[in-house]
A protein has these predicted regions:
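Conserved catalytic core of nucleic-acid polymerases
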Residues: 468, 566, 580-581, 585-588, ...
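C-terminal polymerase-core module
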Residues: 487, 491-494, 498, 502-549, ...
Length: 852
C-alpha cells in the first residue's frame, strides 16, 4: 500500500507565493488554490498512491505553544488573500474525494509523523509532501519526503529518501533533530544555543551523534572554549529546542489501513466550483471532462430543447457557438468540435456548409461566441461574415481581461446564467441567451458600449482579414541570412575559444561560462545561484568592454536570431510565400494585441544584424509597403491626461521631448543638452509611466542609486502634475478596485489592497502604467478599424497587413502608395483629439526595413 500525505498549509503557502495573485471576475483570489491543485496533481502522477491524506493545521494553540510561549512568535499572520482561499480549497478537496485530517492541539507535522510511523509499522510506503524541512527527520526505509521548493518563481519537488539525506547532510534523518536543538530555528522561534549556527551544529552532531553526547563530552578538544560556555549557559534552551523540534508520531488521528482511500466525493460539485473559480484547466487535469457540473436549482431548465435541421431559408436572430472538442489520451479526439445555432428553444447542429452560409446571410443576424474562426471561414469562402453582430468571447475579455481563458461553461457558472432548456448533446446551448444578455448589460453598466462597438468588435473582422492576407517574405533571402549567421557564429566561436584559451568549453553552458569568467578569470561577478554564477544578460552587459564577454554576447545574439527567427520563420511560410501570423485579441491585460505562429511583435530592431531581418519582409511585385508609426504616443497621452503645461508645450512646439525634458530638469538651454543628459531624460520619461524607482533608473542610466534618486526628485518637482496624476490614479484604483483607459477599458487590480508589500507595489506599478499603455492600445486598435474601413470604402487594392506595437503596415500598389500613406496619416492622427495631437512617421519601401 502507498500512502501520500500532503502538508496542506505548507503546500498552499508555497503555491500562494509562487504564483502571482489571480482573481475571478467577481474578485475572489484563486492563485493558492490553482497552485495547490497543480502541485497535488503532479504528486498523484508521481506517487500513484493507493490512499491520500491532506493534513491541515488548526487555529488552536498546540502543545508546543503551551510548553513555550514564544513558539512561532515571530511568524506573521496568514495573508488575507491566502486565508480567503483556504476554506474553498478544503471544500474542493472534499468534493474531489480526498480526506482531510486535523487534530486540535497538534500540528500538521505531527499528523505527517503519525501517519508515517503507522506505515512504517505495516512496512507500507509513505510519501510526505511538504515545504517544511523539519519533516526530513521522518525519512526512513519506508518514508520519503517530497520537499516542495521554489526555483525561478516556480514550485517543484525534491525527492528526499535515505540516500539523499546521507548525501546532503552526512547524518541520519533523526539526527536532524539534534542539529536543530543546537542551532535553533528562527522561523519557528526555537532558541537553540546562542552562537551556534548550522555549520557548527552539524560538526558537533557528526562527531558526537546526539545532544546528550555533546553535553557528555564538553571537555572534548573539538568543542571550542566559547562554544563550551554557550552550551553550558543555554543547556535548558537546547533541550527545550530538542523537544519543540521533534515531530511526534502519536497524534490522535485515524491510522488504519484504508482510512484514506479516495472516495467518489461530489465530482459535479467540484466541476461547478472549478468553473466558478475560473480554473477550467484543472477539470481536465483531474480527469473530470464530461462530468456535468452541479447546477444551481434556480437555473435548472423546465423544458427540453428540440434538435432540428437548419431551415432551408433561415431568418431572424440566432445564437451561434461550438461544442468544444473532447480529447482523450495522447490528445486523441474523442468528440470533435461541433458548431450549432440556437433560436428560442431549438438547437440546430450545423454542417460546415450550413455554418459558412449562415455567416453571410442577409436575412439573419448572429450573436456568436468566438468570432475569429468564423470570420476566417467566411473570408475563405469569399464573404465577410457580415451576419455576425456580437461576440460573447470579446465581451468576456472586455469584462475581465485578467482571465486565463474564456470558456462558455466557466462563464455560465460565473454569471449564474439561467438555462432556457436542457440539451444533453449541446449542454451549453441553453445558457447562451441569458449569459449573453447579462454580459451585454454589464458592458453597458460599465460604460464600455462604445469601446466594444467601435473598437473591440469590429477589430475582430480586421484581424481575421490581416491574418488571411499575410505578409510576403523572401524565402531565399532568409535562407542566405541564415547561412551568414551560421558563418558569423563559427567565427565568433573561434574567437571565444582563443580568448578562453581552450576549445573544451561550451559557451551555451551558464555553469561553464560562470566558472571561466568569475573563477578562472576573476572578473567582477553578480549573484550566485545553486548552479553557479549568474551569466544573464544584465550581468554580462556590465562586462561588455572585455573582448571575451563582447564575443559571448554577440554569439548569443546571433544564435537567437538564427534559431528563433531564421529557422522559425522558414517553418511557417505558407504555400503562397506569405506568413500568416495569428493575432491574439483576448490575451493582454492592458488591451494590447499579441501575435503568434510566428510572433512578429518581437522581430529585433536594436542591433544591425537584427534589423536586417526586416529586409526579408517584402511587398509583392508592383507593390510597396507603407509603414506608419505613432511618434511617442504614450508620452503624448501622458501629457494629455496630466495636463502638464511643460510637457504639452514641448510637444505643441515640435521640440524634441527628451531634450526639452533634460533642459527643464537641469535648467539649461536645449542646445546645451548633451547626448548623455538626453538619454537620462528619455529613460525617466518612459520610466515614470512604468513606476520605476531610483534603483531601476540607476541601472538604466548608469549612475548610483543616490544620483538616480536626486534626478527623480528633480523631475517630479519640475513636472508636478505627473506625480499628482500618478498618486491620484493609485488612490482611486485602490478605492474602486480598478483603473481605466480614456476609452473606459477597465483592469482590475486586487494587488493594490494586498498586505504583502511586494504584491502591493506591483499593483501600484500596474495602476500607473495601464491607463497610459491601455489608452495607446485602444488608439492603435481604433486606427486599425478606421484605416481598414477606409481602404475598403474607397475600393482600393491596398491592404492592411500587419501591426507591431504602435506601427501599422499597408501593402499598396505603387499607384496607390501616396493615397495609402495619406489615409494612414489621416486616420491614425485623426481618430482621437487630445490636448497634444497625435503624430505619425510614414515611410514607403520595397521591404519592411526600407519602409520603417
Amino acid at each position: 500500500m502507498r500512502l501520500l500525505v500532503i502538508d496542506g498549509n505548507s503546500i498552499a503557502n508555497r503555491a500562494f507565493y509562487c504564483i502571482k495573485l489571480l482573481t475571478t471576475k467577481d474578485g475572489r483570489y484563486t492563485n493558492a488554490i490553482f497552485g495547490f491543485l497543480n502541485i497535488m496533481n503532479s504528486l498523484l502522477r508521481e506517487c500513484e498512491p493507493d490512499e491520500v491524506a491532506v493534513a491541515f493545521d488548526l487555529k488552536h494553540p498546540t502543545f508546543r505553544h503551551e510548553m513555550y510561549d514564544g513558539y512561532k512568535g515571530t511568524r506573521h499572520a496568514m495573508p488575507d488573500e491566502l486565508a480567503q482561499q483556504m476554506p474553498i480549497l478544503k471544500e474542493l478537496l472534499t468534493d474531489l474525494g480526498y480526506r482531510q485530517v486535523s487534530a486540535k492541539g497538534w500540528e500538521a507535522d505531527d499528523i505527517l509523523g503519525t501517519l508515517a510511523a503507522a506505515c512504517e509499522a505495516r512496512r507500507d510506503d509513505c510519501f510526505l509532501a511538504t515545504g517544511d524541512r523539519d519533516s526530513l527527520q521522518l525519512v526512513s526505509e519506508t518514508t520519503t519526503v517530497l520537499l516542495a521548493t521554489s526555483a525561478m518563481g516556480r514550485s517543484k519537488t525534491e525527492t528526499m529518501d535515505l540516500d539523499a539525506i546521507h548525501e546532503k547532510y552526512g547524518i541520519e534523518p533523526k539526527q536532524l533533530i539534534e542539529v536543530k536543538s543546537l542551532m535553533g530555528d528562527t522561523s519557528d522561534n526555537i532558541p537553540g544555543v546562542k552562537g551556534i549556527g548550522e555549520k557548527t551544529a552539524m560538526t558537533l552532531v557528526k562527531n558526537f551523534g546526539t545532544l546528550d553526547s555533546v553535553y557528555d563530552h564538553l571537555d572534548s578538544p573539538i568543542i571550542k572554549p566559547r562554544q563550551r560556555e554557550n552550551l553550558l549557559a543555554c543547556r535548558e534552551d537546547a533541550y527545550l529546542s530538542h523537544t519543540l523540534g521533534t515531530i511526534r508520531t502519536d497524534a490522535p488521528i485515524d491510522t488504519a489501513e484504508g482510512a484514506y482511500k479516495v472516495t467518489e466525493g461530489n465530482k459535479p460539485a467540484a466541476v461547478r466550483l472549478m468553473q466558478e473559480l475560473e480554473i477550467q484547466t484543472l477539470i481536465t487535469r483531474f480527469g473530470l471532462d464530461g462530468i456535468v457540473p452541479e447546477q444551481d436549482p434556480d437555473t435548472l431548465p423546465e423544458v427540453d430543447a428540440a434538435i432540428a435541421s437548419l431551415p432551408a431559408e433561415p431568418s431572424g436572430h440566432y445564437l451561434v457557438a461550438a461544442r468544444p472538442a473532447v480529447l482523450g489520451k495522447k490528445s486523441a479526439v474523442v468528440q470533435p468540435e461541433a458548431w450549432y445555432a440556437v433560436q428560442d428553444t431549438t438547437v440546430y447542429p450545423l454542417s460546415e456548409e450550413e455554418l459558412v452560409s449562415l455567416l453571410d446571410d442577409p436575412k439573419v443576424t448572429l450573436d456568436v461566441f468566438d468570432s475569429a474562426p468564423l470570420y476566417a471561414r467566411a473570408m475563405a469562402a469569399g464573404s465577410w461574415g457580415s451576419s455576425i453582430v456580437w461576440d460573447g468571447k470579446l465581451a468576456a475579455y472586455l469584462l475581465d481581461a485578467s482571465a486565463s481563458h474564456y470558456l462558455l461553461t466557466t462563464l455560465a457558472t460565473s454569471y449564474h446564467a439561467r438555462s432556457a432548456f436542457s440539451c444533453e448533446e449541446y449542454p451549453d446551448a441553453g445558457f447562451l441567451a441569458d449569459l449573453f444578455a447579462k454580459m451585454k448589460a454589464e458592458i453597458t453598466e460599465n460604460g464600455e458600449d462604445e469601446l466594444y462597438n467601435n473598437i473591440e468588435f469590429p477589430l475582430a473582422q480586421v484581424l481575421a482579414d490581416m491574418t488571411r492576407t499575410g505578409i510576403l517574405v523572401d524565402r531565399k533571402g532568409i535562407e542566405a541570412f541564415g547561412v551568414q549567421l551560421r558563418q558569423e557564429l563559427d567565427q565568433v566561436l573561434t574567437r571565444i575559444e582563443m580568448e578562453a584559451g581552450t576549445s573544451d568549453f561550451n559557451p551555451n553552458s551558464p555553469k561553464q561560462l560562470g566558472t571561466l569568467l568569475f573563477d578562472t578569470m576573476g572578473l567582477p561577478h553578480g549573484k550566485k545561484t545553486k548552479n553557479g554564477w549568474s551569466t544573464d544578460a544584465e550581468t554580462l552587459e556590465k562586462l561588455r568592454d572585455i573582448p571575451l564577454v563582447e564575443d559571448i554576447l554577440q554569439y548569443r545574439a546571433c544564435q537567437k536570431l538564427n534559431s528563433t527567427y531564421v529557422e522559425g520563420l522558414l517553418k511557417v511560410i505558407g504555400e503562397d510565400g506569405r506568413i500568416h501570423t495569428r493575432f491574439n485579441q483576448t490575451e493582454a491585460r492592458t488591451g494590447r494585441l499579441s501575435s503568434d505562429n510566428p510572433n512578429l511583435q518581437n522581430i529585433p530592431i536594436r542591433t544591425e544584424m537584427g534589423s536586417k531581418l526586416r529586409a526579408y519582409f517584402v511587398a509583392k511585385p508592383g507593390c510597396v509597403l507603407v509603414d506608419a508609426d505613432y511618434s511617442q504616443i504614450e508620452l503624448r497621452i501622458l501629457a494629455h491626461v496630466t495636463g502638464d503645461a511643460h510637457m504639452q508645450e514641448a510637444f505643441l512646439s515640435g521640440a524634441d521631448i527628451h531634450r526639452s525634458t533634460a533642459a527643464k530638469i537641469y535648467n539649461i538651454r536645449p542646445e546645451d543638452v548633451t547626448p548623455r543628459l538626453r538619454s537620462s531624460a528619455k529613460a525617466i520619461n518612459f520610466g515614470i509611466m512604468y513606476g520605476k524607482g531610483a534603483y531601476s533608473l540607476s541601472k538604466d542610466i548608469g549612475v548610483s542609486v543616490k544620483e538616480a534618486e536626486a534626478f527623480l526628485q528633480t523631475y517630479l518637482a519640475t513636472f508636478p502634475n505627473i506625480d499628482g496624476y500618478m498618486e491620484k490614479t493609485i488612490a482611486d484604483a485602490r478605492q474602486c478596485g480598478y483603473v481605466s483607459t480614456l476609452f473606459g477599458r477597465r483592469r482590475a487590480l486586487p494587488e493594490l489592497n494586498s498586505n504583502n508589500h511586494n504584491i502591493r507595489a506591483s499593483g501600484e506599478r500596474m495602476a500607473r502604467n495601464t491607463p497610459i499603455q491601455g489608452t495607446a492600445a485602444d488608439v492603435i486598435k481604433l486606427a486599425m478599424v478606421r484605416v481598414w474601413r477606409r481602404l475598403r470604402d474607397e475600393k482600393m487594392e491596398s491592404r492592411l497587413i500587419l501591426t507591431v506595437h504602435d506601427e501599422l503596415i499597408v501593402e499598396a500598389p505603387e499607384a496607390e502608395a501616396e493615397k495609402a500613406a495619406q489615409i494612414l496619416r489621416e486616420e491614425m492622427e485623426g481618430c482621437v483629439h487630445y490636448a497634444v495631437p497625435l503624430s505619425t512617421d510614414v515611410h514607403t519601401g520595397k521591404n519592411w526595413l526600407e519602409a520603417h
